[in-house]
Structures are given as C-alpha cells and as structure tokens.
C-alpha cells in the first residue's frame, strides 16, 4: 500500500551536489547556503513529480509550499536571466550617497551579526535544545516517519521504581529485579544511589533468575512478590494471559535463606492459579484456583479449600470480566486484614449474565487443538458479558476467619438489593478488625460507605450521598481511600480515612474522623481538581501528598498539605508549565518525580518535605531522545482555549513545520471525548498525530469538549443520559472556527478516533451531515450503547429501561446524514471482547438497507480492541494514513462520479 516515505538516499546525494544561492525559507528566515540547507530546499519539491516522473495521486503528500514549481524557483536565481548591461560611471554626489548608505548598512549588518551570534541562530537546528513552545521551525531537519512513531523511537525512556516497606517500617527501600550486574531480586536503600553514609545495606532475595524443583523441573519467574518479612518470595512461572488484567500461572514459594523453592500446593504443583498473595504476617498464602479460594499456611504442607462451589459461573477471590474491566482494573478481588486474621473476598455469581461469543478464525487462544475433523471450524469463546440493561453479576462480600476456619457475610440494614449493588472498593481499617466498603447502586449515582466490624459480625452505613440530586452526575470508581489510624501523641484522637469529596462543583479530598463521621475536614478546595488522590500519607508528620490541576487543567503538579488542611505547598519548584507523574515511597520520605513534558522528559528521585535529610538522584535525562528530537522537524504546538456556549474548552493545534498563514492547510481533528478523559495535556509526545502534521503537512487539532475531565463537574456531567450529543456538537463548533481561519482549506476537514473516539467520530459526521466535516475515520467504534457493558454505560446513561429515548438518540442511526459526507472509514477487530464487532456489523446493516455506499471497511481477524494480531497494528495506521491522504488529495470526490471506462471514452468522443 502506498505510504509517504523519506526520499531515497541516492536522490538526496544527487541533489546535494546542486549548489544554489540562498533564498528565504518558508518561515521567513534566511536559509543557509550549505549543502544541507540547499538539499532541504530542493527536497521540498521532490513530491511535485518533476524528478521521478508521473506519480499516482494516492502516493502524493499534501505540500505546504506555495512557491510554485521547482523550475520557476531555479529561474529566479539564474544568472543568465535578462540582458547584459554595460557599466557606466558614477558621479561624485551619487558616490557620496553610496558611501553613507554603505556605512549605515555595515553598522546594521554588524549589529545583526552580534544579535545572530548571541541568540545562537548560527547553529543548525540539530544542535539547538528542544523548545516545546516554539512558534516556528527554523532550519531543516529529518521528517518524522510512521516507522519512527510505531517503533517507539520517540518514546521517552523511563525507569520504574517499586517502593517496598521494610520489615520494621523502613522507608526509602526499592525492589529491583533483573538489573544488570546485580543479583536477580534485590532490596536496596535508595540512598545508596546517592552514595550517602546513611544508606543501608543491599539485601538479596534471589541470587539467580531461576531455580530448580527436584531433579528435572527448572523454574523461570514471570513475576515475583516478596513477603513482608523478606524471608519468602512468591514466584509465578509460565504466565498465560486471560483478559486485559488477568492471567494464570504456576506458583512457587521460594525460601530466601536456603535459596530453594517448593510448589505452592505440594500435592498439585502443575495446577494453574489465578491469583495468590502473602498474608501481612508472611505466614500464609491465599489463592484462587478454578474459581475456588484456598489457603496454605507456610508451617504446613497442607492446602485448605475455603470454598467448594466455584466454577464457570461462580467466582471467589477474582473478578469476572466486567468487574476486572470496569471496577478493579486488576486480577484480584481478595483483601487480607492487616493483622492477618481475616480474608475479605468477593463472591461473584454470573449465572444470570448472558453470554457473548467471540470468534477466532486464525488462532486458538485456548491452546487446545480441535478434535479430528473439526480443524476447519473457528474457536469460539463464550464470555459472560452484561450489556446495558441486561442482568449484572450478583456480587457479595464474604469473609474468612483464619483461626476459626469459618466463612461468613455480614448483612447491612437498608443495603442495596443484590441486583442493584456494585461493590467498588474494600479498605481494611488497620488492625481494628473493621473494614470500609464502598458501594453504589447499579446506575452509579447513589453512594454508600459501609463500616463492618468483622469480629462482631455487624455493620452499618456511615455515609450516603446522592449525586444525582446534587448535580445530576455520577460517581466514578475510585481506589484511593486511605485509612488513618488514631495516634494521640501525633494529635489524631480517632481513627479516620481520607476520601474524595465533591466541593463546589470540583473533585477534592477530605479527612473523615472518627470513622463514622460524615463531615470531612477539607484538605483541598478551589476551582481545580485533585487527581487520583491521595498519592501518599506520611503518618509520622501528618502530611498528605497529592497531585492536582491547580496550575492549569492541562498540567499536573505534586503538592503536600497538613492533615488539618493547612500549610499547602508544592513539592517541586517549577516555574513553567509542567506535567508530573509522582510515585512516593511507602513512608512518604522520597518520591520518584517523572517530568513528562512539555520539554524532554526526565526522572529523578528526591526527598520530600517530610524528610529532613535532603536527597536527589537523577535516574533518566533522555539524552538520546533529545538528540533524536533535534535532528527531526516536529510539529508546532499551539495550546489554547475556545468558548463554546459559555464553556471554556482546551484545544491543541499541531501545525506543520514551516507553517505559514499565507497557505491553505487541510485539518484533521483527533479526539477521544470519553467521560472524564483528557487528551489536551502539556506532555511531550510524538505520536501518530505528530506524524500527520510533521510529515504529511496537515494541521491536526484536538478539542477536549464537554464531558471530558479536569475542568469541573458542570462541564463533565452535562452529557449524562445523552452521551455523544455535546461531544459531537463541540467538535463541529470547533471545526467551524477552524474552517473560518485564513490558513485552513475549509473543504478538507476530517475527524478520527478510536473506541469512544470512534463513536464520537461517527456521531459527529452524523450530526454534521457533511456541512463542516467532509471525512471521518472510526476505529473500533461503539454504534449503539445497548451493546456495551452495563457498569460503564449505565454510569453515564442510566439503564435502557429508565432512559429509552436517550439510548435511541445516542445510537448511530441517521444513515441518510452519513451519506451526505464525502466518505468515511470504519475499522474493527473481529475478536474484540470489549467493543464487540456487533457494533460495526449492525451499522453496516443499516447502511445496506438504506443503500448508503460512501464508506470503506477493514476488519482484522482475531484482533481484540487494541488490534495487534498478525501485524494488524501497523496496518491500522498505514490504512489511516493512506485513506486520509486520498481524502485530502480529492480522490474520494472522484470516485463519487466514477463511470466505466468505455462509457467515459464514448462521452469524450461525443463532445
């Protein structure tokens, strides 16, 4: 398939031999006469067709050069243009005037030279630091290629840090696995990286990356989890993926002192386990196998089976598909109490949940070979998948008393019914024998926080909030509730917890104490929002660390505040815009600060305000990325806000290098638009959108419209019960603004997105009907929200039974309006277990019935939602590039009037 590529080396070498006089570059600056600059000037016209003969329109790139063809450019600098004029004498007055003018010019030239040298403009672009706020590209550089982007060549290098608490509560300890030159699994004091005398010794947990069981079994770890006392390591080998977050494996217990291992279940060592975890006391392991829960006490070889009826429709200790995907984003539904006396776990009953078949035509993910004679049939995996309005799994919280070997549940007065309950978070309240349980109703707009005393086997609701009455919105799933134990010596009279709260229309954090209090001490407030907070609590110093958007909704900065809500301050001193990701040590004394943009990303570990001993260690500076960036021409980024119906929306415009307002550019809109999401961020990123702008010469615009996150609940929750309407409306409103700009070709506007972005793409071109956007590209789109999973969809739409009109309105049904666009593209993975292929197939049927044909379709066998199977990921982006280039080259306009060649020739002869 044709795809824009860099010029061949032999073409570049030949053109570099052409020496021309300097001419103004496209950004207005004077181009150098070096062979490098001359080559770049000539290469701007390679795609005009003059060098390589006739080329198909499909392979043509849009050019942002408005200077005409190369032949005319050469004529302007040809010394033989025009007639030869003989020299004539100059009189004295004219000579004096020339001297004065010459002197003025010389002085001006000298001043310009000084400014030129002081500003570093004499340097080639490849030697200048990356400037993320540059408004123009100067000089020349390599073009970004699609292979650069898909190959991750512009992806920042980063180091992951696994903080781990010491057996005696030591802070600042790291768990390092497989580091070159070290033992396989090591616990190291972070201060040793700074060579300070206070650093503790390294502690080896596993010397080698493999060990032996018996005479013939060799174990190669897929993952490892140390016990809290560092005396044992839980090892998983032969990992096999299940869904997005879940997997199975063989589990082993490794003894640190003897450096030997044994099976987790000595009597069934080859059985695959779904999840396992150490007790906080390091004396037992609880695990799930075949959907039943088991316990192994390490002082015994015996395994105790806690549950007995687990199976294909009943899960213990692990989530089903929808809870894994939409609630926990994890493979565990098991929680040890801090004192190791109890295990809390979910019982998930899927017996009433309908199944959805996912077909695999090429591969066999089960690993099972079909019976003889059935090899030609696809493998079908039946998934229990609750769609909107369909029966949900029945989930209940169970407890197991280790000492008494008893399993029980605690009933709560006025609790949600089994069919209307979502259990979204479990937090043990220290060693008190109490547990906090967060529940919402099925439609996620009523929250109940329940406190259970497992020793007394009683419980009660301590907080209840109805957000539908507050602002008409919903509760998102959160897993950041943090227990704060009482400590009178530190001024904490009662137990409490930190939780997210809604304050004056924005998401903040509050401290609830005692545990049954429903009135928080506000830790943050203002017209900005905290992000997944708290990040860490320093109990010794009563400090709370969190990340927020206080500096700007497109930025992220870490802060610290006292537990009483006073003395708030920033953790990092950064004067300009910045986007930080923060990972704090277990005690809060250290933090890995990952600066993600807008400049070149870097990482360093620093001491926090909790720590009296100052520490700083740079881990990553991305020097290689800096050099890579300097050698390439990146898009010009313009961050801005626009006003749509009184709402301020964040926008990122990516302009081509050498952008000129005197030219007319096609514009591609890229968006995701999902509830609470954000695409316009001050991060460093060179992605597919960067490639489109920098290589193809198109403008790429991203608008975070209504419904997206971090600008307050009013903007976010307006979409409830009618998702797709405001998202599409805002994309169209923004497109009209761009269409009116003098540097935009209003006939060449397109929009694309993936998943929710694919849905919004189709909804936008459906609403617009070809009046503003002419083209759309949708990958893995939802086309009818009745087809998507219940927990996600009903959070924003209620159930179809309670909101039938909303579901009708939000579905893609106006195929006549779709036919008014020039053309659109749909792509989907056939084995998508998330957004089912049913969405695309149903829309195609509607198009067929209506006789609509102005679209293209590409499906990918055996690919799931990420579309990776058998080179599919590369093909997706190749197809997007090729299809968009054809669109902006006018090819799709031509095929609207296509006729058989014989007929066309006959008409031509008849003229």
Swiss-Prot record:
Compositionally biased tracts (Low complexity): 25-39
Q: Which residues are glycosylated?
A: 268, 564, 809
Membrane topology designation: Single-pass type II membrane protein
Keyword line: Aminopeptidase, Glycoprotein, Hydrolase, Membrane, Protease, Serine protease, Signal-anchor, Transmembrane, Transmembrane helix, Vacuole
Q: Which Gene3D superfamilies match?
A: alpha/beta hydrolase, Dipeptidylpeptidase IV, N-terminal domain
* Keyword NAD listed: no
Q: Name one GO biological process term.
A: proteolysis
Q: Where is this region: Disordered?
A: 1-39
Q: SUPFAM superfamilies per the record? A: alpha/beta-Hydrolases, DPP6 N-terminal domain-like
Entry function: Type IV dipeptidyl-peptidase which removes N-terminal dipeptides sequentially from polypeptides having unsubstituted N-termini provided that the penultimate residue is proline.
Q: This chain belongs to which protein, by name?
A: Probable dipeptidyl-aminopeptidase B
- Protein source organism: Phaeosphaeria nodorum (strain SN15 / ATCC MYA-4574 / FGSC 10173) (Glume blotch fungus)
